[in-house]
């Protein structure tokens, strides 16, 4: 049996996941993180994107995170997300529309603030579409 640890993924609205996992992948403030059993203690900000959860026995789940905090302790990991949405609950049409609007805003931006905000919106829309795609593949 593979080594595991306990993972909790919670948002302000609800608990999204609680259980034993073999590993997770998430984008931290310094880049991609792979958290395996026995990982050193860590506290870091999470960038908007997805968390890939590899559950016990290799089953995968994908959740979109709008940002938050990741805490790694011996034997347990906690993700405190600003917003968390399961892949199957994301609306592909809305994500595609958000991507299109963000791309238009980037083209018509008139300053650094407009461009930065539109780029952040584009990154979020692309991350949602990626979560949708991976969720469909895993089903």
Swiss-Prot record:
Subcellular location(s) of the protein: Cell inner membrane
Membrane topology: Peripheral membrane protein
Alphabetized UniProt keyword annotations: ATP synthesis, Cell inner membrane, Cell membrane, CF(1), Hydrogen ion transport, Ion transport, Membrane, Transport
GO cellular component annotations of the record: plasma membrane; proton-transporting ATP synthase complex
GO molecular function: ATP binding; proton-transporting ATP synthase activity, rotational mechanism
Keyword Ribonucleoprotein: no
Subunit-structure text: F-type ATPases have 2 components, CF(1) - the catalytic core - and CF(0) - the membrane proton channel. CF(1) has five subunits: alpha(3), beta(3), gamma(1), delta(1), epsilon(1). CF(0) has three main subunits: a, b and c.
Entry function: Produces ATP from ADP in the presence of a proton gradient across the membrane.
Family: Belongs to the ATPase epsilon chain family.
PANTHER family in alphabetical order: ATP SYNTHASE DELTA/EPSILON CHAIN, ATP SYNTHASE EPSILON CHAIN, CHLOROPLASTIC
Name by which UniProt lists this protein: ATP synthase epsilon chain
């Amino acid at each position: 049996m593979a080594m595991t640890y306990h993972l909790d993924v919670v948002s302000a609205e609800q608990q999204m996941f609680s259980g034993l996992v073999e590993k997770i992948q998430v984008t931290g403030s310094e880049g991609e993180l792979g958290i395996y059993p026995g990982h050193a203690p860590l506290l870091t900000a999470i960038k908007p994107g997805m968390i890939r959860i590899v559950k016990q026995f290799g089953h995968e789940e994908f959740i979109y995170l709008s940002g938050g905090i990741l805490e790694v302790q011996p034997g347990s990991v906690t993700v405190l997300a600003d917003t968390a949405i399961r892949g199957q609950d994301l609306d592909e049409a809305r994500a595609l529309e958000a991507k299109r609007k963000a791309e238009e805003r980037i083209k018509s931006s008139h300053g650094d603030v407009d461009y930065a905000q539109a780029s952040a919106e584009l990154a979020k829309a692309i991350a949602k579409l990626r979560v949708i795609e991976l969720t469909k593949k895993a089903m």
